[in-house]
Each structure stands twice: as C-alpha cells, then as structure tokens.
Amino acid sequence: MQKTIISVKNLQKSYGTFEAVKGISFDVYEGEIFGLLGPNGAGKSTTLEIIETLRDKTSGEVMVDGMNLDNEPDNIKKIIGVQLQSSGFYPGLTLLELIRLFAGLYNRPVQPMELLKLVNLEDKAKSKYKELSGGQKQRFSIATTLINQPKIVFLDEPTTGLDPQARRNLWDLIKDIRSKGATVIITTHYMDEAEQLCDRIAILDEGKIIALASPDKLIDDLVATGFERPKQVKAANLEDVFINLTGKEIREE
C-alpha cells in the first residue's frame, strides 16, 4: 500500500465573499509526481501555496508527512523545496554565489557544482543569473529547491513561457528528481505536460476538484463513453516537427 505523504481534507480559502478554493480533498502518495491541472483562476496556485505554508487557509486540514500544518509549519518547511520565481533571485550574482547564499539560509552544507551538474548548468557556474536564458533560469530555480534535500518538491507552472525543447528538458529533470526519491507536486495548465509527467492529476475548475485519477484512467473513462476525436491522431505533432528541425538536444536553451 502506498504511503500518503500529503493529505488535504475540506480545504477552503476565501477572500472576502470570493471562494478561491471550495472545500477540496485529495491525497498525494510518497514518490509520485502529482499534478494540479486547470485553467487560470482554478485555485491551483492558491492550493499549492497553502500546503507550502506560504498562504493561510480559511478552513480545512492539511497534513504533510504526518505533520499538521496548523501546529508544525516550521517543521514542514524543513522537508519541502519550493521553486522561486525569477524575482526571488539577485540578478547580479553568479549561480555559485546564489547557491551559497541559499545554503546559508538553510544552514546546510552544499556542493554547488553537484547541484549545477544535476540541472546541466555546471558550465554556467560563474555566469550571473541575469545572463541565463529562460530555460536555464527555470532549471536553476529547480536546483535551488533541492538545496535542503527535500522530501517534497513543489513546482508552480514550471514550464510557462518556455519553448518546446526547453519544456521537454525540464520534464526530464523533474522525472530525474522523482527517481532520486522525492515526491513532486506541480501545477500546470498544459494538458500534454500533465499527461507526460504525472502519475495522477487532480483537475480543478472554479475552486473545485472535478476529477482525480491517473491520466490514462481519465482518458480511458472518456473513451468508454463513446467519445472520439474529430480527426485521426497522427504519429507525430507540430511540436515534434519543431524540435526535430531545431536540433533537439543540440539546441541551446
């Protein structure tokens, strides 16, 4: 039986009369990639920020690795890695300097070059953050989530704004992080991303979970209703063409 590492029960978040999250419940299993999928405004990021201890909930219960969010937020922070957005980094510092800075905040020894190697940025170690491309910035931000050797990694829309090759490289990185033992939770509004990455997804709309299962199960259930696509699925799509023409792994992000 899979161990539940995050349990959310009847989570609700209101801003005045507006309900951003409407009493949702779900579990995340240890070692899986779990996705919160939905359009903008569905409540994905709000839910993630509550679990990360970054935003107060209105009501409900959140347990993280056996710890109650209400009683042990500081202990929860010690076992999670949260992806920072670009505004969270000093643009004039090098990647080595930034890693050492964040390691100092965690009061934890770290091997900066090992972290950079994990995200294929060792050749950028002495580059300033502002000199990185969009894909490189995203990979570096994920590297910083791993400084405290977290049990759970949270990634909020990790591939937004990236080109197709950079997105696929980031997918490989996320799978690699999971293969090393971490549980990963992502939010996304990309259907292909959820299908490729996630073991299970919760589909949110207007603050409610309207479906929760593996991508394959959700697709099979839809097909079982008699649903058919209006045109035949081809062996490749336009994104595959783009990546093939631009050189795959040779292309600089």
Go through each PLM region and give its residues.
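Conserved ABC transporter NBD signature motif
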Residues: 60-68, 75-76
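Conserved catalytic motifs of ABC-family nucleotide-binding domains
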Residues: 149
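ABC ATPase "signature
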Residues: 212-213
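Conserved ABC ATPase "signature" region
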Residues: 100, 104, 109-124
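Conserved ABC ATPase signature
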Residues: 128-132
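Catalytic Walker B motif of ABC-type/P-loop ATPase nucleotide-binding domains
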Residues: 153-157
